[in-house]
């Protein structure tokens, strides 16, 4: 509005010509001049206010600019941190990519090696399965053989008793018929008409079979351990079964030895009745120097001894344990013949007689087996120093 008044006054003055101004009076000119001065002062005040307003706005804008600068600086700092973090993450990504490539190569190589090893192990597994099948077949065959041998040993018509009787028959074929009651090893343990034949026939056959089994097992066990070789292909179960059989045979042999010792020490009358004097004192007096038992129950013949030994006796290293026991039994028998009166013969029962005869059968079967396996013992027995029952 002031601008409008000032413009209107300027237009009024500028529109007035000089002639008209000269015509005006002093009072009118002073009024016009003061009016113009007032208008100028108002315009100046208005301009000052406007400048203050502008300055205030400028200050506000400056404060805003400073705040924006601070925000911008913070954003720049954050941007720098993010840039550095991006660089770090990019490095990690590169490392991870490189590591993943290496792991891929390692995985492919490992898979190849594993497949090769699996193929090799599958081949070995097939071979082991084939070997296991062959071992199972061999074990079954060996078990059948062992069972057959065990049945043959424990059977009533075992080969051991037959062989022992045949060997004794061949050795003593020239001897005359023996008396029935003298403890001879006949198959019927006496004649068919003897009074104790029918009473003890079944018991004596069972005892003979057991004695034949013990004799056969003793011959098998008398071989040194390095001569007994286990076949290749026997597994632990078969070996354990064989060892159990050997242990059982040893126990039976020990029982037989204990029975013999008990009969020798506690039943002297039975021994006297069961054995007959086939040997003179002169023959038995030359035997004790050779009656030393062996350590392992087996005969080891040295080349020098076997080549230079006379035919009339058996060296110590050649005498089996059965021969030694038989000599001891015969010596006890001779002593009984000299010491015990004949009145004790009446005290023996039929059962005691059968037991004594069976013990004699066992002893002479062992002598026959030893003579069949050792030529020197066969020669010694054929020299009429020991004549067992047929």
UniProtKB/Swiss-Prot annotation:
<comment type="similarity">
    <text>Belongs to the CCDC85 family.</text>
</comment>
<comment type="function">
    <text>May play a role in cell-cell adhesion and epithelium development. May play an important role in cortical development, especially in the maintenance of radial glia.</text>
</comment>
<feature type="compositionally biased region" description="Low complexity">
    <location>
        <begin position="182"/>
        <end position="194"/>
    </location>
</feature>
<feature type="coiled-coil region">
    <location>
        <begin position="116"/>
        <end position="146"/>
    </location>
</feature>
<dbReference type="Pfam" id="PF10226">
    <property type="entry name" value="CCDC85"/>
</dbReference>
<keyword id="KW-0175">Coiled coil</keyword>
<feature type="coiled-coil region">
    <location>
        <begin position="26"/>
        <end position="86"/>
    </location>
</feature>
<protein>
    <recommendedName>
        <fullName>Coiled-coil domain-containing protein 85C</fullName>
    </recommendedName>
</protein>
<dbReference type="GO" id="GO:0043296">
    <property type="term" value="C:apical junction complex"/>
</dbReference>
<feature type="compositionally biased region" description="Polar residues">
    <location>
        <begin position="157"/>
        <end position="172"/>
    </location>
</feature>
<dbReference type="GO" id="GO:0005912">
    <property type="term" value="C:adherens junction"/>
</dbReference>
<keyword id="KW-0217">Developmental protein</keyword>
<dbReference type="GO" id="GO:0005923">
    <property type="term" value="C:bicellular tight junction"/>
</dbReference>
<dbReference type="InterPro" id="IPR019359">
    <property type="entry name" value="CCDC85"/>
</dbReference>
<keyword id="KW-0965">Cell junction</keyword>
<feature type="region of interest" description="Disordered">
    <location>
        <begin position="153"/>
        <end position="237"/>
    </location>
</feature>
<keyword id="KW-0796">Tight junction</keyword>
């Amino acid at each position: 509005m002031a601008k409008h008044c000032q413009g209107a006054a300027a237009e009024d003055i500028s529109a007035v010509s000089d002639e008209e101004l000269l015509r005006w009076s002093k009072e009118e000119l002073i009024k016009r001049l003061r009016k113009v001065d007032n208008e100028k002062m108002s315009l100046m005040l208005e301009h000052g206010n406007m400048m203050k307003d502008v300055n205030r706005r400028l200050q506000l804008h400056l404060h805003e600019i400073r705040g924006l600068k601070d925000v911008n600086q913070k954003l720049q700092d954050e941007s720098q941190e993010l840039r550095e973090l991006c660089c770090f993450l990019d490095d990690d990504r590169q490392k991870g990519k490189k590591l993943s490539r290496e792991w891929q190569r390692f995985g492919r190589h490992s898979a190849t090696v594993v497949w090769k090893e699996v193929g090799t192990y599958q081949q070995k597994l097939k071979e082991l399965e084939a070997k296991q099948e062959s071992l199972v077949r061999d074990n079954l065959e060996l078990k059948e053989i062992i069972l057959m041998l065990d049945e043959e040993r424990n059977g009533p018509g075992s080969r051991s008793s037959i062989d022992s009787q045949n060997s004794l028959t061949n050795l003593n074929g020239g001897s005359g018929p023996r008396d029935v009651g003298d403890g001879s090893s006949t198959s019927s343990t006496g004649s068919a008409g003897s009074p104790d034949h029918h009473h003890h026939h079944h018991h004596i056959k069972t005892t003979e079979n057991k004695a034949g089994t013990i004799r056969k097992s003793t011959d098998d066990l008398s071989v040194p351990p390095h001569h007994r070789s286990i076949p290749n292909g026997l597994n632990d179960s078969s070996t354990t079964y064989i060892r159990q059989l050997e242990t059982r045979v040893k126990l039976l042999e020990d029982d037989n030895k204990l029975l013999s010792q008990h009969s020798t020490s506690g039943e002297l009358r039975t021994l006297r009745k069961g054995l007959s004097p086939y040997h003179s004192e002169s023959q038995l007096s030359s035997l004790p120097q050779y009656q030393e038992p062996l350590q392992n129950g087996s005969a080891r013949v040295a080349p020098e001894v076997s080549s230079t030994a006379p035919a009339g006796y058996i060296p110590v290293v050649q005498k089996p344990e059965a021969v030694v026991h038989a000599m001891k039994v015969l010596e006890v028998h001779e002593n009984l013949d000299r010491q015990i009166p004949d009145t004790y013969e009446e005290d023996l029962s039929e059962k005691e007689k059968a037991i004594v005869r069976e013990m004699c059968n066992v002893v002479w079967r062992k002598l026959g087996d030893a003579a069949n396996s050792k030529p020197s013992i066969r020669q010694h027995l054929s020299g009429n120093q020991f004549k067992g029952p047929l």
